[in-house]
Design a protein with these regions (language model features):
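Conserved cytochrome P450 K-helix E-x-x-R motif and the immediately C-terminal K′/meander segment
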Residues: 19-41, 218, 222, 305-346
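N-terminal targeting/anchor module and adjacent flexible "hinge" preceding the catalytic domain
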Residues: 1-52, 59, 63, 69, ...
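Cytochrome P450 catalytic-core helices
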Residues: 272-297, 407-424
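Cytochrome P450 proximal C-terminal region
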Residues: 30, 37, 126, 130, ...
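Conserved cytochrome P450 K-helix/beta-meander segment immediately N-terminal to the heme-binding cysteine loop
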Residues: 358-386
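Cytochrome P450 heme-thiolate monooxygenase catalytic core
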Residues: 2-10, 32, 72-80, 98, ...
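Alpha-helix/helix-capping structural signal
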Residues: 58-59, 361
Length: 456
């Protein structure tokens, strides 16, 4: 079996200087790395007046994300400014006591019992989409990334707000998110470099972000108002409102803060999953042996029935495909933190205010930690294989700030791949050229058309 090597940005033969880095990063933050970046443990660069450090070994990543987490807890000020118009002080960008309180309130919503409850909505939404595909007929061209985005948005909307409210409002909210994402894309370089907010170009983009964020706020506020009228028991918004009640009867969060957390859940719950699923179908389409093994597993475990939550533990190869997809295409390819106080790592002084980057794109393709790191080999994640060294695989981040929705995302993705792959094959047209786009998340660039084949 010859493993597929998906295309990736050209790597520079030697380290590029700060001005070259700026040039390449204008359009793609993943095109600025040289070959040595996939071999080295710790790197530093001074870009303009900003000190930038890259933690690129398991021990340093552990130090930054766990052992000295309090010093590297905070997102960069510029990243906060980019996301605050949308998320306010939501879980994704808060820190300190605010973050700890929000995390504590929401953690029970993502325990196994709740995920199993949500899985019924997840499964029915996937089946509904698959039925719509079936009705289109064999050899229909499916724009896969758009379809996966719609699916993930429907799932999180229905899980958050209930079947009726979610179905009626997901499209409007997703459209508003797309507008916001286009602004964030323009801000990616300034966020990464920590350019000051007073710079005209940066300031103008922050203004655009605020206007786009307000559109989303209005849409979500309207949905919450309807949800509060009752009849939405078992939804995430209902669980969040209940969890917000303290024993003394005093609300732990304001209405505005609840809205912020709902937006965080919606944003994190549809964007990353949609991207992972789109990349998964692309990789499967280029790997006939992988597809054959996937179909064999689905036939053996499911025998044509719709997968349920209890099946997930037996869909080991399906899960391995997703794990390998997230290794090659990490949902969030660059994690940025700010050093609050001066520090020292491996003899290098880390000035207060420096950017400390943990880059899943690098560590998950690092030549010290992965054999054939650029190859698509799901078998490396199968039971019995050597497990990846801790802190070399970070699709959901790591440490105390590991993604709260990790189990939800895995459940959703496994059920989606199992349900869809049982009924369809997706073929990439010969003329199609697949490229990536690095925003806050890593997604296919432009459209991803695939030919839908109904399995007999």
């Amino acid at each position: 079996m010859t493993a597929f090597i998906p295309p990736y940005p050209k790597r520079h033969e030697k380290e590029i200087n700060p001005f070259q880095a700026l040039y390449y990063a204008r359009n793609d933050l993943l095109s600025m790395w040289d070959e040595d970046a996939f071999k080295m443990d710790f790197m530093s660069q001074k870009i303009l007046k900003q000190h930038v450090f890259i933690a690129n070994s398991p021990d340093i990543i552990r130090y930054v994300m766990v052992e000295n987490k309090d010093n590297y807890e905070r997102k960069s000020p510029q990243m906060k400014r980019a996301l605050e118009p949308l998320l306010g002080d939501g879980l994704f960008i808060s820190d300190g006591k605010t973050w700890a309180s929000r995390r504590r309130i929401q953690t029970p919503m993502f325990d196994n019992a709740h995920i199993q409850m949500y899985s019924k909505t997840i499964s029915s939404t996937i089946v509904e989409m698959a039925d719509n595909w079936q009705a289109k007929g064999n050899d229909t061209i499916i724009e896969v990334h758009t379809e996966m985005a719609k699916l993930a948005a429907e799932i999180i909307a229905r899980t958050l707000f209930g079947e009726k409210l979610g179905a009626e409002n997901s499209e409007a909210v997703v459209s508003a998110f797309a507008d916001y994402q286009s602004v964030v894309k323009q801000m990616a370089l300034s966020n990464f470099l920590g350019l000051p907010d007073w710079m005209p170009n940066v300031n103008a983009k922050i203004g655009k972000a605020k206007r786009a964020g307000q559109t989303i706020h209005n849409a979500v506020d309207a949905i919450i108002a309807l949800a509060e009228k009752g009849g939405h028991e078992g939804t995430m918004v209902d669980e969040l409102i209940k969890a917000n009640q303290s024993e003394s009867g005093i609300d732990l969060m304001t209405r505005k803060q609840i809205r912020n957390e709902i937006i965080v859940l919606f944003m994190a719950g549809h964007e990353t999953t949609a991207n992972v699923l789109a990349w998964t179908w692309y990789l499967i389409s280029q790997s006939p042996d992988v597809e054959k093994k996937l179909h064999q597993e689905l036939d053996e475990v499911l025998n044509g029935r719709v997968p349920e939550y209890s099946d997930i533990e037996n869909l080991k190869y399906t899960r391995a495909i997703l794990d390998e997809t997230m290794r090659l295409y990490p949902p969030v390819p660059i994690l940025s933190r700010q050093a609050l106080k001066e520090d020292e790592i491996r003899g290098k002084k880390i000035p207060a205010g420096s950017l400390m980057l943990v880059v899943p794109w690098l560590i998950q393709r690092h030549q010290k930690h992965w054999e054939n790191p650029d190859h698509f080999i799901p078998e490396r994640f199968m039971p019995g294989e050597k497990k990846p060294k801790k802190f070399t695989y970070l699709p959901f981040s790591a440490g105390p700030r590991v993604c709260i929705g990790k189990s939800f995302g895995i459940t959703e993705s496994v059920l989606a791949v199992a349900t869809i792959a049982q009924r369809f094959r997706l073929e990439l047209p010969a003329e199609a050229e697949v490229k990536h786009e690095c925003r806050l998340t890593l997604r296919p660039k432009g459209k991803l058309p695939m030919i839908m084949k109904i399995r007999s």
